[in-house]
Regions:
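Well-ordered beta-strand positions enriched in small/hydrophobic/aromatic, beta-favoring residues
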Residues: 52, 83-85, 105
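Structural motif
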Residues: 67-68, 81
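Compact nucleic-acid interaction/catalytic patches
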Residues: 86, 93
């Protein structure tokens, strides 16, 4: 019987929940730490990452569901990236899209509208991985 290689884990801060639906508030301080293997997730060890728990169903088309944990990295987004963003002061998890030089946020569920910032769009992190409990 072969044993699988052991991967070291590192604790990442769980900063609260993020709405995958209509934008809402997000916590700013760590509630706990989540052990994550940078090797398994293919994330560089020096990456500045954090974890949020998903609440809502606006990203089901991207296979991100209510209760999932998302690992996000602090870095600039590229067109098409899934991001945690503050749009006009409220946090949400959406796809970052640039059209005609203007960024907006797009849900991966047709029940939700595109979000065009009236004033401000601040990217808080770019999705690196989704973690789901088995059987969820």
């Amino acid at each position: 019987m072969r044993s699988e290689p052991a991967y070291a884990t590192e604790p990442l801060p769980l900063l609260g929940e993020i709405v995958a639906g209509r934008p809402g508030a997000v916590e700013g301080r760590a509630e706990a730490c989540v052990p994550v293997s940078f090797d398994v997730l293919e994330i560089q060890r020096n990456a500045r990452c954090f974890v949020l728990k998903v609440k809502g169903d606006s990203m089901i088309g991207a296979h991100i569901v209510d209760g999932d944990l998302v690992v996000l990295e602090l870095r600039p987004p590229h067109d098409g990236a899934i991001v945690a963003a503050l749009i006009d002061g409220e946090a949400t998890l959406k796809r970052y899209v640039v059209r005609n030089g203007r960024p907006f946020l797009k849900a991966e569920n047709p029940r939700y509208p595109e979000l065009v910032p009236a004033q401000e769009l601040v990217i808080q992190g770019v999705l690196r991985a989704v973690v789901r409990k088995a059987g969820a």
